[in-house]
Amino acid sequence: MLRAAVAAAEELRSPLLRVIGTLRDGRGSVLLGRRVRFCSNSSASDTEAAVAEAEAKAEDASAAEGEADSKASSAIVPTSTNIDDCLSVIALPLPHRPLFPGFYMPINVKDQKLLQALIENRKRSAPYAGAFLVKDEEGTDPNIVTGSDSAKSIDDLKGKDLLKRLHEVGTLAQITSIQGDHVVLLGHRRLRITEMVEEDPLTVKVDHLKEKPYNKDDDVMKATSFEVISTLREVLRTSSLWKDHVQTYTQHIGDFNYQRLADFGAAISGANKLLCQEVLEELDVYKRLKLTLELVKKEMEISKLQQSIAKAIEEKISGDQRRYLLNEQLKAIKKELGLETDDKTALSAKFRERIESKKDKCPPHVLQVIEEELTKLQLLEASSSEFSVTRNYLDWLTVLPWGNYSDENFDVHHAQKILDEDHYGLSDVKERILEFIAVGKLRGTSQGKIICLSGPPGVGKTSIGRSIARALNRQFYRFSVGGLADVAEIKGHRRTYVGAMPGKMVQCLKSVGTANPLVLIDEIDKLGKGHSGDPASALLELLDPEQNVNFLDHYLDVPIDLSKVLFVCTANVIEMIPNPLLDRMEIIAIAGYITDEKMHIARDYLEKNTRQACGIKPEQVEVTDTALLALIENYCREAGVRNLQKQIEKIYRKIALQLVRQGVSNEPDHESVSASVTEESGNGDNTTTKDEILKDPAVEDASVTNNVTNPASEEANEENLTSEAAKEDSTSKGNKGTDGAADKAIEKVVVDSSNLGDFVGKPVFQAERIYEHTPVGVVMGLAWTAMGGSTLYIETKKVEEREGKGALVLTGQLGDVMKESAQIAHTVGRAVLLEKEPDNHFFANSKVHLHVPAGSTPKDGPSAGCTMITSMLSLAMGKPVKKDLAMTGEVTLTGRILPIGGVKEKTIAARRSAIKTLIFPAANKRDFDELASNVKEGLEVHFVDTYSEIYDLAFQSDAGTETS
């Protein structure tokens, strides 16, 4: 008997098959017999008795086998209670779709109290509950199913809160099965909630709803039902969801009455829950049919769309398969005829052809590796990952320029010409480079020292490297190591890694196509260091001429001869370069450009190139020398000329805007610019070109910029044209012709020192000379900064005077070294004053305040020692120092003057401030003598060994110190 009950339950597994049986007009279903009934038109009948009898027999059989689990039940439910007597039911929330009469719906009940109540109902032979759809929360889309989150929030609701979230109209459902928390419901008839009876579990009073009376023979009703039946049959035929039961459904669908037909159509549709709830709530059968017709029509359109998409995809897949098969057949036919070889043979032939021309120059160990890899390639399947790795490896091995060298040019006169073409000034740097080339001419090769160009940003280090490559007729390749922290960037990845690649040097050789390029390693002082190793240590093997003969890249894993490669490095601060690397380099310092050199560069190179780049003709604009001089001295004091180029570009952009507003239209100048270098770009490949003419010494790598600008002034002047420019603009507009010619009569735009601020804003740097005649206690010193040289005033003032209370107060953001220099200066000054004026007790009785403007700028260094002594003595004796005098030098406790650095920069700063007399340490005389004559011209320079000589120069007019 138990087996019979289980068999009966198995027959109920397909929900829609059971629906067919329940929805027919009182005629028993062949599939379900009389085991299930449709609740809306049944009372205590023979069907109920049969169901009860079958269930009783099943329970007796299960009791005979053993005690059943309390939470489990068979699919056949005893229903001794009359369904019309169900006026108070437990409310079950349905989160996703309403339950229609005649349909089964499985739900999960997480609330143990509710689950226990359902089990108790079944035991009392009253297995009924009310199933009500849950309303959406405000602001949610009913078309989006929120899943377990919404179910969890519903489970937390109790009593009135849950009642508010339920739709009033639901379905009286029979509890057909309970397995754990899994409950299966069978819908019977429509209900409406009237009031709440109990809060937990939620129990409500309900009214049983009946359809409104209708005329079965109404033509409109019949036509609508026929259309619904026709559409349903079409949906069932086209939908993949019901394809296994198409024959059964379409056979019995015509037997449904109107109300059950409407419920059936709405239940199998994929409409959202609100539309389905609307069908459930509709008691007018005709309106319900119309609503269902809309839903099934939409379902049919969706089914057709789904079918068309599936068909298109299937056709595409079959078409691709057909093409693939035809291609394979074609390959096989060609192979049989000898017209085509397979991929592996073609690849091997390509690699052998590449290496054939280099066989005589290629090292034997490399040829051996290539042959081994070619043999390995033939044994691998083309679809394997190892095949791809081997193919890429062979590609790199065969593409490298083994033994291919470019012819070098060691002509010193040719090199001198190129260096002069590309750069103005820098005579000492050019001389060092020519010496290097001369040694290469005598040796026949440039193998040897590694050049390191050091200097501030914008002085032309990178472009000098290009010029050397042009002079030697070598290919040029640049890569920056600034911030590089991965050794694999230099030495490559091992082939075992996915996506492995060779290092930069192997990529360089492939890019330039020669084995002796000039490689510029930019920003070598900014090498990083991370968990992936130390790149500085990896560069040791690369740069050392004794080791790079057999440089081993991790990817290639064969020795490569890099001894013919000329390496040029650039750095801003050589102190940041690791000592083992620095020891292998020949340092060439590039101090920067003086004002005269900047004037020539701006006039001959920068202005000309910028004017052409902006499309402006020479007759349309004039930038005077006074404007360029003011631009250099008041806006661009840095050692390089990169910022000067930016300011000139800003001027010409504003001029271009004025000309366009005046209606000027120039034909573009078509100038061919050819390049002879290969330069690394961010992530792209390098390119090799010929005969580049680079005349802009400011062109250097863009990864380091250290220019001082005034952002506020720049922004303001970028947005507004000047009043002077506006006047010229209006004047030019007044002079325009009316004949429509391309070149219209305009007034020439002139930029001079008077209107320079209208184009580039207010000056960034103010005049360094504060005093025309230095007062008592004030002396001008000379300092070195990152921007070059500058003048520096030392000011002293007596704060108070009390016997025996001599002291020194320091301000001006002085560093530790400068504070120590001030203490030494105070001691030495006291000794000098005691020697010169024994009766003057100024230092013993006076508290002196020493200040170094500007207060916001940090300052440090020992070179202001002699200036501090002179300032204190001037205050102590009440004498001002000699006019137009500036000095620099470190002083010892015994009054000796020690050498300092930055002689060139400090001399330029003195000339800029119109200083005529300079005092330097005697040890710096050689540095001063090496300066260009135009830098030294017009200066009276004294070189001193002791402070007593400075005292005579500063406070007496009959000094006899050595003068230059």
Swiss-Prot record:
Family annotation (SUPFAM superfamilies): P-loop containing nucleoside triphosphate hydrolases, PUA domain-like, Ribosomal protein S5 domain 2-like
A molecular function GO annotation: serine-type endopeptidase activity
UniProt catalytic activity: Hydrolysis of proteins in presence of ATP
Biased composition regions of type Basic and acidic residues, renumbered to the chain: 688-698
GO annotation, biological process: cellular response to oxidative stress; chaperone-mediated protein complex assembly; mitochondrion organization; oxidation-dependent protein catabolic process; protein quality control for misfolded or incompletely synthesized proteins
Cross-referenced InterPro entries: AAA+_ATPase, ATPase_AAA_core, Lon_bac/euk-typ, Lon_lid, Lon_proteolytic, Lon_Prtase, Lon_prtase_N, Lon_prtase_N_sf
Biased composition (Polar residues): 673-687, 703-712
Source superkingdom: Eukaryota
GO CC terms of this entry: mitochondrial matrix
One Pfam family recorded for the sequence: AAA
Cytoplasm found in the keyword field: no
Quaternary data: Homoheptamer. Organized in a ring with a central cavity.
Protein name listed in UniProt: Lon protease homolog, mitochondrial
